[in-house]
Every structure is written in C-alpha cells, then in structure tokens.
C-alpha cells in the first residue's frame, strides 16, 4: 500500500495521531472491505467504496463479530480522479497532485481471496 508523505501527514493532522501503521483488513457492516491502521490509542479505517473512492474514519472493532468494524467519527473521503488525489474532511477538500494513494495490489489480493 502506498500513501505519499504529503497525504499521510495531512491524515495524521486531521485525526490528530502520530502513528499510522497498516495492520490488516476488516469489513464494514455493509461488507465493504477496509484497511485497518494502528495509530497508537486510535484505530483508523480506509473503507473501499470503489476502486477510486474511499471513506476514512476512526473505527472500533465489533467484538461480537470479530473482523467487522463500525465508524466512531463521521466519514471523510478520499477520491482519486483526473491525476489528483482529494481528501475531503468536514466539507473542505485538500487536493494533492498525482496519485498520493494506491492500494491496487491489496485490492487484487482481496479479490483473489473472494474467488
């Protein structure tokens, strides 16, 4: 998984975390795949909506249903389009030139696991 430093620093700023370490995949209640990140005392998910559209938010695991998570903050969005990456938080959009986020290989692995 690739997250360019400028986007990574903005994510850390938005969520007020110092660490952002990918640890595993999970599922949201609608069965969307999620990438789970350890951020010290917090857990953040990047939920796959489509190949170019993602939700990002703080999350907690549902211990009654291991592997499934729920949002504990409002959803923010990552959009990759027209050779730009956009992070939308609280109605404000920050645009990063080029592809600042790429999880293509992880999406391929998830698709292979499903088949």
Annotate the PLM regions.
Residues 1-16:
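Charge-rich, low-complexity N-terminal segments
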Residues 15, 48-52, 60, 76, ...:
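N-terminal regions of proteins, emphasizing targeting and processing segments when present
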Residues 1-5, 29, 98:
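Short linear motifs centered on Gly/Pro in flexible linkers and helix caps
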Residues 69-115:
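Ampiphathic alpha-helical segments that act as solvent-exposed interaction surfaces
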Residues 17-22:
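Short, surface-exposed loop motifs enriched in S/T, G, D/E and P with embedded aromatic residues
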Residues 8, 12, 37-40, 56, ...:
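A generic structural signal for ordered secondary structure
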Residues 23-71:
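Amphipathic, interaction-prone secondary-structure segments
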């Amino acid at each position: 998984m690739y997250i360019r430093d400028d986007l990574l620093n903005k994510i850390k700023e938005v969520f007020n975390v110092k660490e952002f370490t990918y640890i595993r995949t999970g599922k949201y209640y609608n069965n969307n795949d999620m990438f789970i990140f350890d951020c010290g005392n917090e857990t953040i998910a990047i939920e796959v909506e489509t190949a170019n559209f993602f939700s990002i938010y703080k999350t907690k695991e549902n211990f009654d249903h291991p592997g499934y998570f729920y949002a504990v903050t409002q959803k923010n969005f990552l959009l990759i389009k027209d050779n730009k990456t956009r992070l939308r938080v609280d109605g404000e959009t920050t645009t990063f030139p080029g592809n600042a986020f790429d999880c293509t290989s992880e999406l391929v692995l998830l698709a292979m696991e499903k088949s």
